[in-house]
Amino acid sequence: MVYEVHIPAFPLNQFIESFVYYMDYNPAHTVDRFLPDGNTYIVIDLTDYPKFIYDNNSLKEIQSCRNVWFSGIRTNYITIPSGRDSEMFVINFHKGKTYPFVEMPMNELTDYVVDGELVMSTEILNMRETLLELI
């Protein structure tokens, strides 16, 4: 298993809390539930198969996520895959500091996970291709 956390230097550290990269993580459980914590994330999936968001009660798939997506502030918990067999790069933002990177008001993204192409600049979206070239 690989799990790396990088704290960016100035000026990115004013906005980004950390970069997280992981692969070959294989927990025994299949789903995770994340409580609302006021954070926002850009998730870059480095695999070719979709990840899902599940209904919190029935655990039925309610949304598919591919390549790059943005996860807004939550007011309720979210149920997602545990990360088994995933390879991801996650950008964790400081609370309230996402605005330079997402081209949409944050209040419109509360409780939503949206395709990166809908809310992010081309430069952010191109990060996935750059990361794939590096690994």
Q: Language-model features: where?
A:
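Alpha-helical bundle regulatory/interaction domains
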Residues: 1-135
